[in-house]
Amino acid sequence: MEIINVFLFLIILFLVKDFVKKNKKIHTKSPSGPIAFPILGNVVQIRFWELFKIQEHELFGGYSKKYNGVVRAWFGERLFFFVSNYDVVKYFQKDENFHNRPSVLVPGWRYASSNGLGVMSSSDDKWKRAKSSVSQSLRVRTTKKLMEEKAIEFIDSLEKISNNNEIFYPKGHIQGYACSMLFKYMFNQDLSVESGMSRTIGNAVEHVFGNLSKLTAFDCFEIFSPLYDWFFTRRLKGCDIVRQIISSQNENHLKSIDPSKPRDLMDDLLIEYGLNEITKEDTMQINQICFDIFGPAVGTVTITMNWVILQLCNRPELQEIAYQEIKKAVKDDEYVNLNHKQNAPYIVAFIKETMRLCSNGFGLPRTAKNDQICGDFFIPKDAIIFINYLEISQNEEIFKNAKEFNPTRYLDESLPVPNIHFGVGQRACPGRFVAIDKMFLGISNLLLKYKLKTQNGEKIDDSIQFSVSLKAKDYGIKLEKRI
């Protein structure tokens, strides 16, 4: 009996100590947060509110308002900060102290990033070299013609659906459009927008996005570390599907590359990393850079275009404004090209407004190299920080009438709005301008050829589904050919 009492005492002591550790402030300006329970921390609140259909982005939106835009949260034994205070975010934009990704990554991210490689999850010199390589390739390689050709192929592939009065399900077709364009740029390989490979890759990326956004015990407790690879190999199968494709392309390029005539991004990376002197780690880095590009180039573009089409259907009066602008810009041309973009600012504004209200979530984590005071808040060294872009986008002090869907807010230069659609500061997406062009071509050509209608005349459900990028529920629409 005495042993049991001692055992119970030790358990209680541990729980009290853990509770104090999780809730005690280490600095007078330490951010506050909801009560963190022993062992599980704030996972308790997440799971509790899930019972009432409250998703993570909604829960942390409420916490953001309560705790002045910087929320402390414990997930098991891991400490996070969710930041929507824009004055604090400005420090992340400008200060090199916040340019790195966490060295102790959440295990799911660790697995998806090959333990902190690539252009999205690496830090310091590794990241700077990867970013420079990708940026240089984007500058050298002219993607204008490629994007315009793929946009035409995308639109032409919808002819059969329209002629047969079939329901158009945008997501799969957008995945094909994004994948086929990326394959040509990255591997110099032609891939039809309707190919099975495009759908396979698109589904794999969606699978990774969805599962990375869901907390598991393996993400929260170091004790499970021996089982990480076993668990995430099964949970993140989409990673391995994409990695196998990239690895095969890497091997084929090594056999056929002509250093004097690089064909694509893979050639550019192989040359940058030394070609015949490439180490195993270099190969992993090259492959991870390509993997990282698949995420935003396929996943984020698909999610955003899917949202844009939904908003155009639900707002026919705004769809008509966008169509008239496109029609006027193209004049007698059969398709929209990038030369028309300067005369079609409304559709670009429509895309940005959709991203602001719908698809921007928490982004990727960053960390603090050293302790730092950011305005009214103390951010400790090695903190894992997520920027809550959705909450920033709904802040009335930053965006006037923030809850209102109003693309024209991006057309008034006298009222500047933050450009947070692709991240902030040095860690913003290096391919953001290409992504906007790709979406502009796809959406504007779709509008030029078809009037987009809901199936039954009622609005499509626009409730947000939590993911790495916030996504819409799957839906179908009618395509009415314009005369």
Swiss-Prot record:
Cofactor requirement: heme
Pfam entry (one): p450
Positions of transmembrane segments: 1-21
GO molecular function, one term: heme binding
Entry superkingdom: Eukaryota
Matches recorded under Gene3D superfamilies: Cytochrome P450
Topological type in the membrane: Single-pass membrane protein
PROSITE patterns referenced in this protein's UniProt entry, alphabetically: CYTOCHROME_P450
Subcellular location: Membrane
A GO cellular component entry from the record: membrane
Designated name of the protein: Probable cytochrome P450 517A1
Gene: cyp517A1
